[in-house]
Amino acid sequence: MFSKVAIVGFGSSGKRFLALAKEALPASEFLVVTRRKSGIEGTEIASELGELEAFGPDIVVLTGPASTRAAVVRRIPPQTVGIFLEKPLEVSLAAGLELSIMLNRPFRVTQVGYNLRFSESLMKFRSMVQNQEYGPILGVRAETGQYLPSWRPDRDYRGAVSAKAALGGGVLLELSHEWDYLQWIFGDTAWVRAWFGKASSLDIDVEDSAHVTMGFESDEGLEVVAQVNLDFFRHDRMRTVTAICERGTLRWDGIAGHVDGFPEGTEQWESISRGSGIETTYKAQWKSFIRAIETASKPEVMLADGLEVLRVIEAIRLSHKNNGRQVAVDRSGVVL
C-alpha cells in the first residue's frame, strides 16, 4: 500500500525510524534526506529538499531540529497520506499554528512523536489515576533530569539540538514529553506559574532547568496542582511522576518502567507493574501510525496534541517573563 517512504534527518531518531519502517514495510522504496554522503546501505540518499518532492512519498517522517519543520512541510507533495513529526511540533506556538495550517489536509494522517504514551507502565499508571484506584488526586509531583553530555556520549553535546536555542533546544522543548503526558493523564492545563533559566556551567545557550506549577482543569470542580522540575544537569538520571491520592500514593518510574503504590494503612511501597523498556514504545508508536493511515482514523497523538504542548510552553514563557505570576493557558487560535 505504501510504496515510498521518506525520512528527513538522519540522527539517532532518523536511524531508528528508518529501521522501523524497513521492518514494517520491507517492499517499500526508501529515501533519506540528509547531508551525510555515506553510511546508509540500501537506501537512496538526497541532500536537497527538492528531491523529497520529486520522490513523491506516501509517508514522510520528519526528524531533526523543530526549527526546520516548515521548510520540510512546504516540500511534501499533496498525495502524501501520512506525516510523522518528531516532538516537539515546532519551536513556538505561533510557528506551530502556522505549521498546522500547512499540514491540515483531508485524508491525511499527521501524528506527533510523543512515544511515552505507548509505555506500558505509563498506561497502567494513567489507568489507575483516572479510575481513582487510590481515590481522588490531591497533588502531583513530576521530576525529570539527565546530565546533557551523557545523553549521546559518542558526540559533543555542545553541537546537539538540545544545546542550541536557534534549533529549538532547552528543557522546555527537549523535555516536552512531560507537558504532553501530564495532560494526557491529569487533563488540560488551566494555568501555570514558572521559572526557568541556566543554573549549571554547561556550554549551552538555552535554559538547563525549569520549575513549573501547573493547575489542571477538573470536571468535578476540584483543581489538581502539579509541581514539575526539569533539568539537563543531574547525574542520577530520573523520570518520575508521583500522584498523591486520598487513599495512598502512586508512583511511575519512567526509567525503570515501574509503577509502585503506597496504599493507606501500609508502611512500605508495593510493586504494581513492571513494564517493558522505552524501546518497545517506538515500535508501538510506529504500528499505531501505520494503522491510522490504513484505517483512515485519528492517530493516537494528533496534531492538536502537539499544539497543546506548545500552548503550555507559551504560558510558561509568559509566566517566567512576568516574574512567575500565574498565567492562563491560551486556547484561542484553534485551527483544527
Regions found by a protein language model. Give the residues of each.
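Beta-strand-loop-alpha-helix segment that lines the small-molecule cofactor/substrate pocket
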Residues: 59, 65, 70-117
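C-terminal helix-rich "cap/oligomerization" subdomain common to oxidoreductases
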Residues: 30, 59-62, 131, 217, ...
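Active-site regions of enzymes building and remodeling cell-envelope glycoconjugates
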Residues: 41-52, 81
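Predominantly a Rossmann-like dinucleotide-binding segment in NAD(P)-dependent oxidoreductases
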Residues: 119-203, 323
